[in-house]
């Protein structure tokens, strides 16, 4: 039961109690009276001697409070005093009646409020029941959609946890940045603007000196080969791919020539990235088939050995035609003096920091390697060097700074075994190993711009890095 209803019940019980007292007790005020008050489980003898006394500690079987007024002992001589006490008691009863009336009014007001609230609660309960029914309908209709949304949101929980962690770190970083800014501000004040300008000038001076130093770098000696880096896997077991060592920094075209014979299609790619992705930019149909895989692109033109001959062809990519052709005198061809793997690799054309070269063998030199420097325009032999290294015993070869480096095999375990310097016309045996990852090298050429070896290894286009020992010229050396 609510609090206002309890309050109303208490008031009604109190009014009944007072009414019972006035009807039963007040008529006996004229005489003596001795009353026993019933309290739960006890009986108490009361002998009034000092005037009227009011007790309200007893309860009837219905739980109502029973107030009992005990009159003092009767004394005819003290009637005036008793009358005075009666008046006082009546005043108290009147005051109590007034209080009860006020309490009754409040209780009625509270009771009306309770009734109003009860009506409102019933309406609210019905409203909630309606909302609950609507909610169930809504949940039945959209439960799967909400579940999918929740499933989508579940992965965000660890993200939010991480975000909170990151937020703490960001706060720390902000604090550190503030501290660092303060330190930098102090440093800047100590150094001053003029010191920054001086430091900038020193950096520019160092850059100039570095460029001058790079210009004084002479051709280096091969010390080490590392790699390989596999750029792409394509084509047959044998072929060639190359870039132009004299091209500008913005020109990174790649040329691709698959197979060592019976082909005359050259594919061009604008960059290494396009080559890897297969985004071919142009195709050239050469007027002649090539022999071998030892071609070279130099200053915008392709140099290759014409099939079944010792003729060298110069083909311009820009003009799309042959610019020059010349027979390499006494040079063996068509697998007379190839490298160890064969493939019509009799004539090897290559380029380095010095210029254009041809490596081949002749009967006059007993099948040993001959090195010839060529004029890039006319293909005329400018100068030749005869070595004592058998061409058929060489796996591959390449030129770096006028020195020919020869590998002892095209198979696993190959190394740079022999070198010949055209500057000093001397040779030496070397021991520079490299990793033949795919077991069969059919093309190995040096690119001076990239400072790298381009190789075709069993259908894989790979790159090797080279380490050169450089000598820096000083003003005293010039």
From Swiss-Prot:
Residues 1-23 form the signal peptide. PROSITE patterns: OLF (PS51132). SUPFAM superfamilies: YVTN repeat-like/Quinoprotein amine dehydrogenase. GO terms for biological process: eye photoreceptor cell development. Expressed in the brain (at protein level). Disulfide bonds join 219-401. InterPro entries: Noelin_dom, Olfac-like_dom, Olfactomedin-like_domain, Quino_amine_DH_bsu. It comes from the Eukaryota. Glycans are attached at residues 33, 95, 179, 299, 465. Residues 218-470 form the Olfactomedin-like domain. Peripherally associated with AMPAR complex. AMPAR complex consists of an inner core made of 4 pore-forming GluA/GRIA proteins (GRIA1, GRIA2, GRIA3 and GRIA4) and 4 major auxiliary subunits arranged in a twofold symmetry. One of the two pairs of distinct binding sites is occupied either by CNIH2, CNIH3 or CACNG2, CACNG3. The other harbors CACNG2, CACNG3, CACNG4, CACNG8 or GSG1L. This inner core of AMPAR complex is complemented by outer core constituents binding directly to the GluA/GRIA proteins at sites distinct from the interaction sites of the inner core constituents. This is Noelin-3. It is found in: Secreted; Synapse. Keywords: Coiled coil, Disulfide bond, Glycoprotein, Secreted, Signal, Synapse. Residues 77-217 form a coiled coil. One of its GO terms (cellular component) is extracellular space. It comes from Mus musculus (Mouse).
């Amino acid at each position: 039961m609510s609090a206002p209803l309890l309050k109303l019940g208490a008031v009604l019980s109190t009014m009944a109690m007072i009414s019972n007292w006035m009807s039963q007790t007040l008529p006996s005020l004229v005489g003596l009276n001795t009353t026993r008050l019933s309290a739960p489980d006890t009986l108490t003898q009361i002998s009034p001697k000092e005037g009227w006394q009011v007790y309200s500690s007893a309860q009837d079987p219905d739980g109502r409070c029973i107030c009992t007024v005990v009159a003092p002992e009767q004394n005819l001589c003290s009637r005036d005093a008793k009358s005075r006490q009666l008046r006082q008691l009546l005043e108290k009863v009147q005051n109590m009646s007034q209080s009860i009336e006020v309490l009754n009014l409040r209780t009625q007001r509270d009771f009306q409020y309770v009734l109003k609230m009860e009506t409102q609660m019933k309406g609210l309960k019905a409203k909630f029941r309606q909302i609950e029914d609507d909610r169930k309908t809504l949940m039945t209709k959209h439960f799967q959609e909400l579940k999918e949304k929740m499933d989508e949101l579940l992965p965000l929980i660890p993200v939010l946890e991480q975000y909170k962690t990151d937020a703490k770190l960001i706060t720390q970083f902000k604090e550190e940045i503030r501290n660092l800014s303060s330190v930098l501000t102090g440093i800047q004040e100590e150094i001053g603007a003029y010191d920054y300008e001086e430091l900038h000038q020193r950096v520019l001076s160092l850059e100039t000196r570095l460029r001058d130093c790079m210009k004084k770098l002479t051709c280096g000696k091969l010390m080490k080969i590392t790699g390989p880096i596999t750029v792409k896997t394509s084509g047959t077991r044998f072929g060639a791919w190359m870039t132009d060592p004299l091209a500008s920094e913005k020109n990174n075209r790649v040329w691709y020539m698959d197979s060592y014979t019976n082909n005359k299609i050259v594919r061009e790619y604008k960059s290494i990235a396009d080559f890897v992705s297969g985004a071919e930019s142009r195709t050239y149909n050469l007027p002649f088939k090539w022999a071998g895989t030892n071609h070279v692109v130099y200053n915008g033109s392709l140099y290759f050995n014409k099939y079944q001959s010792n003729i060298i062809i110069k083909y311009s990519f820009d003009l799309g035609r042959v610019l020059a052709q010349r027979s390499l005198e006494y040079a063996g061809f068509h697998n007379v003096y190839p490298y160890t793997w064969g493939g019509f690799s009799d004539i090897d054309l290559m380029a380095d920091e010095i210029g254009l070269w041809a490596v081949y063998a002749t009967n006059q030199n007993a099948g040993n390697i001959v090195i010839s420097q060529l004029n890039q325009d006319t293909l005329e032999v400018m100068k030749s060097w005869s070595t004592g290294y058998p061409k058929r015993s060489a796996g591959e070869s390449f030129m770096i700074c006028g020195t020919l480096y020869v590998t002892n095999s095209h198979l696993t375990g190959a190394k740079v075994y022999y070198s010949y310097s055209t500057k000093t016309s001397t040779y030496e045996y070397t021991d520079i190993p490299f990793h033949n990852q795919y077991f069969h090298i059919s093309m190995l050429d040096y690119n001076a711009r990239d400072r790298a070896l381009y190789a075709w290894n069993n259908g894989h286009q790979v790159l090797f890095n080279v380490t050169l020992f450089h000598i820096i010229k000083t003003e005293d050396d010039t």
